[in-house]
Amino acid sequence: MLDLKTFLKSFLTVTVFCGSFCMQAQSPFVSRVFEYYPAPGQFINEAYPAYASGESYEEILNKLRAVLLGRKESGIVCLGSWGGYIVLGFDHAVQNKADTVDLKVYGNAHNNSAEPGIVEVSKDLNGNGLPDDPWYELAGSDYYSDSTIINYVCTYYRPSPPDGDVLWKDNLGDSGYVRRNDAYHSQASYYPLWVEADSMTFAGSRLASKASGGGSSWISPPYAWGYADNWPNNHPGADFDIDWAVDEQGQPVYLDEIHFVRIYTAVQEQLGWLGEVSTEISGIEDLHTEIPDLGTDKASMQYLSSNRQLYVQAPQGSRLEVFNMQGLLVFSDEIEAGTVLNNGIEELVVMQYSLDFLPQNVYLLRLSGSWGSLSTGVR
């Protein structure tokens, strides 16, 4: 048995245990997935994330957690047609610092391929750790444009048969279809199959499309600023300032900090053989939190809550160790990570550990190696 006092002293960074739950060291990246309701689209059910027959909504959320949490540009999540959205959260408050941007939203935009998403933020006013407080849109370049529709509402209907085009109707009296694109995406349905309801209604702002073209040639130019998946990730246009927040009447609102981010697809547009415009997200970063440097001779220690789900990204040969509060090693594993290509960039696979065999308790985690990241299943 390892002496607990010696064990604690052997680490350079230790997180703090508070009350009935445990808090990790602050991550600069989102650490929680609360909601995911994509509108219908050509990638829905097929990928980003893929749907397996019979999967529940919670299982879909777990797939998102495995690819989105704890790092940037980890995996792509598709939000589908206009209104489809995701709600994410940080393990800390993102500070609104004066005269600088505060957040970066990662997507997969490149030259003339913008698929803009509207970004909203919320502060945990009631302190319950849930995104149930008011939301504020970060007003981008086109928020006050006459062509932008505020208070837009659109409903999508489950197709019958399931592989049919998806009908939509809006509050302006217009209607249309999310068209099948079977040459490239021939899954059973474009309507999210884990959603039990036969219709999905979304509300928000709708931008006028900038896309143009026809036949085999289409372009979708970026908006000036203030939208997700609009500019490449290395462009300042992927950055956001909390000072852009406005209320439902379009009046500026000052937020000293935020905890939650909601993003939804901002346009309703079909681009021929390219299919519908659908915002895609691969991560969100707090630009004011430094990424911890584990170093080659250092270790990372965090607490594992009673959820007992763990996500690890580390090079092959790194070792994960789990200790109980008496200092006894209760689980260890050598990381045998492979790699995947994401937009031409080689990335480490995120390994998921389900430690359900451990009694519900508090555990200490250590990841040793040249570098790495740990993300627990606290949701």
Positions of predicted regions on the chain:
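Bacterial Sec-dependent N-terminal signal peptides
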Residues: 1-26, 291, 311, 350, ...
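Residue-level detector of flexible, active-site-proximal loop/helix-junction positions
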Residues: 18, 126, 142, 337
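A domain-level signal for the mature, folded cores of soluble proteins
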Residues: 26-115, 134, 139-288
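Short beta-strand/loop motifs in extracellular/secreted proteins, especially
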Residues: 86, 115-117, 316-321
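Predominantly extracellular/luminal cell-surface or secreted proteins
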Residues: 120-124, 323-325
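Acidic, glycine-anchored loop motifs typical of Ca2+
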Residues: 125-134
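Short, threonine-centered small-residue motifs that mark membrane-proximal processing/anchoring sites
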Residues: 288-294
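C-terminal outer-membrane/trafficking sorting elements
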Residues: 294-379
